[in-house]
């Protein structure tokens, strides 16, 4: 294993931050860990997850690990993260699931959400069927986070749910993107 991080969140109950009473929280870090690795782990516990993910990518590169694609979950596939990865001297392309929410992408058809893009591409007859994966898919290049990205949308079966993938590799085909991202599912 190269690196890992453990993060805490405040939670929803204000009287039990992180699910702990004030007494339990106080006892948790009672020893002095100055100058030890434990001190670093305590600091990163409250650190923003996207910031830590960037640090981990930099650390992997520093350790000599080379990779073409950075596989990311939909939680990390946001404008700030994509912008950071593409603006750095990190020579890799993120491939990540996207949420089909309210995020708007600049398309040739105007600013549209993922669901609106799917409807538009379906209406224009730009969705294709992939016999290998037995799914319907469509591809579009859009502007997102001040950079051009390629979006792939796919669904299995007639009543299947649409899923979205985002990448900055403009040469990537749908089949290759699916196979690359499926490596992430295999490791989970």
Enumerate the predicted regions with their spans.
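Residues at the C-termini of beta-strands that transition into short coil/loop
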Residues: 5, 98, 169
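Short amphipathic alpha-helical "interface-anchor" segments enriched in bulky aromatics
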Residues: 176-188
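An internal, acidic/charged active-site-proximal segment
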Residues: 17-159
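Short, surface-exposed acidic/glycine-rich loop or hinge patches that mediate macromolecular interfaces
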Residues: 75, 171-172
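Structured nucleic-acid-interacting core domains from mobile-element enzymes and related host factors
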Residues: 1-19
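Short acidic-hydrophobic catalytic motif
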Residues: 163
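Short acidic/glycine-rich loop or secondary-structure boundary segments that cap or lie
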Residues: 104-106, 173-176
């Amino acid at each position: 294993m190269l690196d890992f991080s453990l993060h805490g969140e405040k939670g929803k109950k204000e009287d039990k931050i992180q699910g702990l009473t004030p007494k339990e929280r106080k006892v948790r870090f009672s020893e002095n860990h100055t100058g030890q690795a434990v001190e670093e782990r305590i600091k990163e516990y409250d650190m923003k997850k996207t910031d830590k993910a960037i640090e981990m990518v930099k650390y992997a590169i520093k350790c000599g690990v080379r990779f073409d694609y950075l596989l990311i979950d939909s939680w990390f596939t946001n404008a700030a993260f994509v912008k950071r990865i593409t603006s750095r001297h990190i020579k890799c392309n993120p491939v990540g699931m996207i949420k089909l929410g309210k995020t708007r992408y600049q398309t040739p058809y105007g600013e549209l959400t993922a669901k609106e893009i799917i409807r538009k591409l379906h209406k224009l007859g730009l969705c294709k069927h992939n016999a290998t994966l037995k799914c319907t898919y469509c591809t579009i290049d859009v502007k997102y986070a001040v950079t051009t990205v390629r979006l792939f949308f796919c669904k299995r079966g007639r009543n299947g749910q649409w899923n979205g993938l985002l990448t900055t590799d403009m040469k990537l085909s749908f089949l290759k993107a699916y196979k690359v991202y499926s490596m992430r599912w295999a490791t989970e």
